[in-house]
């Protein structure tokens, strides 16, 4: 019986979990270049995280242990089986667990954490141990995860109730032909009495054995187990042993553990005080007594840093270099381990971590030495945690060899000397978390995972390099840590890497990312070599003919290089022979082509490694840009064998004539020569006219040589003499020399005279320039001859023009001028001139050479410091004119306000500035001017200032702020009087200087230094110059701010998203800022102080120049805070802050302008709109239509904007995270009102129509008689046809029934792919919306979450008030702007919000329906119209009410016949041809989808290779030879994955169909390729017949390749066509929206080619739109409709019978139906409606037409399936028949009636009888009391209360309250009950509460 219970549980879990699972293939990891596609498997539930992973070493199957699930996956991570392990009702305190005996503890639904997952290979089973029921295990069959046994009835079966993964490890040991042993170590969480920490257990081959998991040995004296003593727990309350890894090697089993150290006699009760040690534990395999237990600490060090906290480990073989370093063989085992630094904080280890290696031989040697020393009696056993005290080693003469397994003495044995490993690699940033290793080509390759989701690839070489990281790839987009378990695929091409929510298959190498030989072979990746002639980096086994010489380069020295002679030629040199030598070349005998960039390609002549090529001809020579003298391009060699360019070098074309000067010509990099007499540069020296005129060295060039500075006063006539070299003598007919000067843009040409080859003189001339603001102007000049032949000026000699008077208005400034200008002061004219321009008789001319020269008439123009303290020390700056020509003239002659002021030599500026320092003032001195003398105090040398200098006494009043952080950096403001006086100020906090920042007359600002005396107050003192200001002020140093938490821990690359920072003392920071550093660049953003514990910040951008649009998640190199001077937070380590890519938006339309109707939603499509972050925070979008915001709903790929009521054209702007996008504009076109002429025309037309109607009525009477006769005749015709096809129907039905039985043979009801309740409800309530806000937690931007939640809880009270809710709904329905869509939305939101209170929701619904009936009858509408359409909130609420309450009935009863009908339709349609273009089929219930031609076809059986295991039997698949390749792929996928939900299958578009002919030949079949037949402008899709595929052919579905064998040459045409028809079969992500996807392929109008399959579209072109429905259907087509109808009849009958029956396989009628029908009857009685037709119609409109028709037409609402267009058309016919069956009106049929009505004309009367009987049976059932109904509703509420987020639903409903607040408040104020309950006030209070945050 128990076994049967296990079996049922396993099968149920298996099927149900697979149905519920959602698997996606995502772009995930990013290598160093690009974004490779990795196979990925995702967690089905965000909270059910992955724990363990293992790969079967023979089959390659991947097994994943997770919370509540164990999965079996294929090698490419597609799911095969999901085995349910939880959640279950449990309590950790129940011991024994409740599965053995009842438990009195409170039970809760508890997750089952997978803690152990091991494959028992010899018995083909999987051991999976969890945390439920005290840690019981299951043995699962590897093939299907069927439970073989779940031992749980003995205490030995309870391993540990610890619900944390990564604390347990197990090792299976088995000898040939014997039962196995399971060594298992686990943490026990203080329950040492219940669970041993280490044990050895039996693992019998028979799963039913009673000894399963028993201890190997268990007696009163000795057992195969070790328990933690209670004394140890008393001493260290948090003591536990965590088992990180285990393995068997040789005759031993090893465990690697982390455990707290146990200090001698000192109790430790705080986990934070613990020191941890990592230990190796060794046991002999065959030691049941555990006498061989030895435990030694282990770890490693580098550069003095100890790494002692074990994180992960992996046992592997060493590569050759590593084996040599360890002095071991390559066959021995090496342990690779990851450690974190130190011994503290094991549960939050530091980022500083290391990869270390330990040879097992070295570990065993150290253990042997420890054993030997102990058996020699040396020291203690050193295992205090287990023994409780120091126990001396016992001396015993026992020989101890390598296989010693202990005695009953000296055991268990510990040690304190650690086993030290070899440190291969360390990192201080991104903590290492996992490790795996294997040997490739003699190298140890180690793969290390990190906490940010990156995978490091390290080549372990041993000393001296240790381990070299050669690549790092980002595996997990969200930055999740890589978990401990990693495993290789069986072919070692892939590594399986796991995070908490994702498993990813990563290739072990990505050689293809390297594009050059140098990159490839310097990458350090041992997998990679250079495949020479294929010009690619790859593994050796991927390179063709790699064994041949130089075909595959394994070291960088083997890279090919190309030498070319000559390596450059002139552009005028054409078709030259070039000699190329290829170094390290493979055999090139198959031919070489030489390519000159993209200019030309020529044949090369090969001779060994030498190639002769011809340079380009005249037409192909490149054009060299005007400003360059050469142009380089790639000279490439292309292999004719591979077609690839395999080596290249730069080749240059040069142009000598680009050089205009001799020096640049002869100094160029090319062979250029200068023709001196022709003044040109040429590559051919023979073109020079004179032999002596040829120059090819710079020394021979004509050129000017340096001379003394050329100074010319403006206006002076002077010659300019220049030195030169090699000046040419002008030849006959050539002009002479000139000097050309460019002065302020004007060119002056002056004749020049050549004296000889080394001298030339510009003739006498004067020069001028404008302006007195320039005293000295450097002028460019050149010497030319023969008009424009320029002499080189290599030193860039210039002529300097100058004016003495410019900028020298005073005597002092004049005499201060540089002596070389020879300027002086002309006293009489008071100006600066040359001596010759000053009349010597009337006025003296002063210059530096004059004796004792002094300038008279000094003047003071300004004093800069005009006040200071009387104590002196103030520096006064004096500006003026003629303030001396030497410091000695003013050194003792300055007084300020009567006080001597000492000039400072270093600050003196001749004639312009004096800076002096004030002396001490006599008491009583108040103010005065500055007085000074120049040299002597005569009147002409004396002056005084107009400004007064004042003595003041500074004072201090207050300080702000009065406290700051200990690290300093606070801006301190000191206020007082006269604090701006003096020239310098100093502020001291205690004995430290406060760094001066700025001051005004009444305040000083300075920056506080770090405290030198710790925390507490310090005195504040101020000094101004020499004055000390008394003060009693104090400044207090307090603790530096600390940051505890950042929420959320993500942003987007542009930043500016809100962050909330929580911590301590945050208010002491004046200008807090947040910073990130990425790629060496820092970015900062602002923060605002909220209070002492909270800051709000805007996230910084990643970097200012970060490229947008990259779909990568980045982690900044540094993240921290700029908090004054607090250095500890500059880099904040306790965060995993990541950046998601920026959102991007597509244009609204190609033109950028979208035409909209008023009220229509605007859909903005984009990418990365919802970052996949945990925690609920979302991006805050604001969308503006013009200046008006709109309501926004966001999903991953689109943003829905409910626009305001606007007309005209408006720009759309999207604001998010500091970015602004404009995807275009919307043009809203309002429906214009009718004009007067239009109204008159309508009235006239109406009158005419009335007359026509009267005439038609008369004619109708006459016609109806004829119709009766026609109907009888037509009915007879149908009967005859039906009898003729009866036999065909029986045969077809029998065949279909066989197929359906095959399809459903292993489908019991639990196997039907039902959607889960939440998905089902969402598709009914909110069709087409995948990610609705009600599915997730409420998200509020900023820090308003609590306020909004509080307000919404107030709103919940209002919603739960019936008076309010009814008033709210009625008010909304009265508003004209409250659209039909709004009504449906509000109804669905209310039902989701009241999901937890269905009793109340039902009460409200009944009241609304009652109101609706009243209103319907008051308006004199026909009663039968009630509930016909969804025009009120009540009607949509009724649909949703039934959807909630009939879900169980759907799953238990109605779902099965509906699913069978769907399967039957799909199977029957696919038995005949289906046109891939038009969607028409041979077998159809719909005339519109019927092929109207005779199509010849044949059924084939194809044998398909099993895609998951090519060695398993082939799968036979029925197809038609006229099927397109895509149709064949769909049928194969249906056959291979017949029991797999549609969303979890591969897509046909992602697969290629291979036709396998023999063992080698494989042909890829495609809908279009180069063999596709094209006739005129028609192109026919390829079919199996086209490829001549025969019966029983072998085919295979393989993942689509990037390139194919037979892609057509006309790629542009075919690609368009293919994409169009591919999309018709593509699964779009959600299994069909409301509108079915019609597989119509639009002909390729752009290219003029039309695509067809079975029927050309123009075959029906002559039929007008309405003809099909109205014409008589010809017999042959009607026969097919009848045949299909007859074949499917049983399935339609089964469905209708189930829906119209009150008894279903023992299940009672759903209470909801009886309850609602009784309510409608009560309403009819209340209104005295006794017409049975009206009551019948109400019930039909209420349930069958409102709910069941929707489900029949859309089975994808209930099941995880794909509904094709032909299936959709047939279901629509069935749904119409269902509707007709519920109608009370008589169906009058004629020849013009639709074919589907004619088709079921005979059946509808009997169906109507079923309906009437059904309604009558329900009426006879006993009434349901309100009490019973409420109990049922309460139970339903409890079951699904958590499916939707109530606060989110309320928030959505509130948007309508906000929109119609005035109308709602008005309605509440008018309602008496609402007034009594003050509801209007409560609504106003709610609006105020919500508006605080908005």
UniProtKB/Swiss-Prot annotation:
What InterPro entries is this protein classified in? Ig-like_fold (IPR013783), Ig_E-set (IPR014756), IPT_dom (IPR002909), Plexin (IPR031148), Plexin-A2_sema (IPR042826), Plexin_cytoplasmic_RasGAP_dom (IPR013548), Plexin_RBD (IPR046800), Plexin_repeat (IPR002165)
Q: Where is the signal peptide?
A: 1-34
- Give the UniProt entry's GO cellular component terms: collagen-containing extracellular matrix; plasma membrane
**Could you tell me what this protein is called?**
Plexin-A2
Q: Which residues lie on this side of the membrane: Extracellular?
A: 35-1237
The Swiss-Prot or TrEMBL record describes its family as follows: Belongs to the plexin family.
Q: Which organism is it from?
A: Mus musculus (Mouse)
Gene name in the database record: Plxna2
Effect annotated for changing residue 193 to K: Abolishes interaction with SEMA6A
Q: What does this protein do?
A: Coreceptor for SEMA3A and SEMA6A. Necessary for signaling by SEMA6A and class 3 semaphorins and subsequent remodeling of the cytoskeleton. Plays a role in axon guidance, invasive growth and cell migration. Class 3 semaphorins bind to a complex composed of a neuropilin and a plexin. The plexin modulates the affinity of the complex for specific semaphorins, and its cytoplasmic domain is required for the activation of down-stream signaling events in the cytoplasm.
- Residues in a coiled coil are 1261-1310
How is it placed in the membrane, per its record?
A: Single-pass type I membrane protein
The protein's GO terms of the molecular function aspect are:
identical protein binding; semaphorin receptor activity
